[in-house]
């Protein structure tokens, strides 16, 4: 499957990333090779091979779900430079408001 430069540019724009034309071409080529390799793996005959659901041989260890007293909100906001109604204000990082 061929990944086009237009697709790379589209995803980059959604991610608020900018690449040169050379970088976009390189990404398209590399991603196409990755997708081709994954498709090739789909052709492997796995008849008689037991499905693998996890690679970890450890059991998941869960902690008890216990309510604990948290840190006081006023104490948490003591060193916050700018806030509004217990929301921390930070500088904008997206030029156009951030809508994808």
Curated annotation (Swiss-Prot):
SUPFAM superfamilies on file: Glu-tRNAGln amidotransferase C subunit
Signal peptide coordinates: none
Pfam short name (any one): GatC
Catalytically driven reaction(s): L-glutamyl-tRNA(Gln) + L-glutamine + ATP + H2O = L-glutaminyl-tRNA(Gln) + L-glutamate + ADP + phosphate + H(+); L-aspartyl-tRNA(Asn) + L-glutamine + ATP + H2O = L-asparaginyl-tRNA(Asn) + L-glutamate + ADP + phosphate + 2 H(+)
Keywords for the protein's UniProt record, in alphabetical order: ATP-binding, Ligase, Nucleotide-binding, Protein biosynthesis
Single biological process term from Gene Ontology: regulation of translational fidelity
Function: Allows the formation of correctly charged Asn-tRNA(Asn) or Gln-tRNA(Gln) through the transamidation of misacylated Asp-tRNA(Asn) or Glu-tRNA(Gln) in organisms which lack either or both of asparaginyl-tRNA or glutaminyl-tRNA synthetases. The reaction takes place in the presence of glutamine and ATP through an activated phospho-Asp-tRNA(Asn) or phospho-Glu-tRNA(Gln).
Binding partners and assembly: Heterotrimer of A, B and C subunits.
Family: Belongs to the GatC family.
Protein known as: Aspartyl/glutamyl-tRNA(Asn/Gln) amidotransferase subunit C
Organism: Streptococcus pneumoniae (strain Hungary19A-6)
């Amino acid at each position: 499957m061929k990944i086009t430069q237009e697709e790379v540019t589209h995803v980059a724009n959604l991610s608020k990333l900018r690449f040169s034309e050379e970088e976009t071409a390189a990404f398209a080529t590399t991603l196409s090779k990755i997708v081709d390799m994954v498709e090739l793996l789909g052709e492997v005959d796995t008849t008689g091979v037991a499905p693998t659901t996890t690679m970890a041989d450890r059991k998941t260890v869960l902690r008890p779900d216990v309510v604990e007293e948290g840190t006081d909100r006023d104490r948490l906001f003591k060193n916050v430079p700018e806030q509004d109604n217990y929301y921390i204000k930070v500088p904008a990082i997206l030029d156009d408001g951030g809508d994808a």
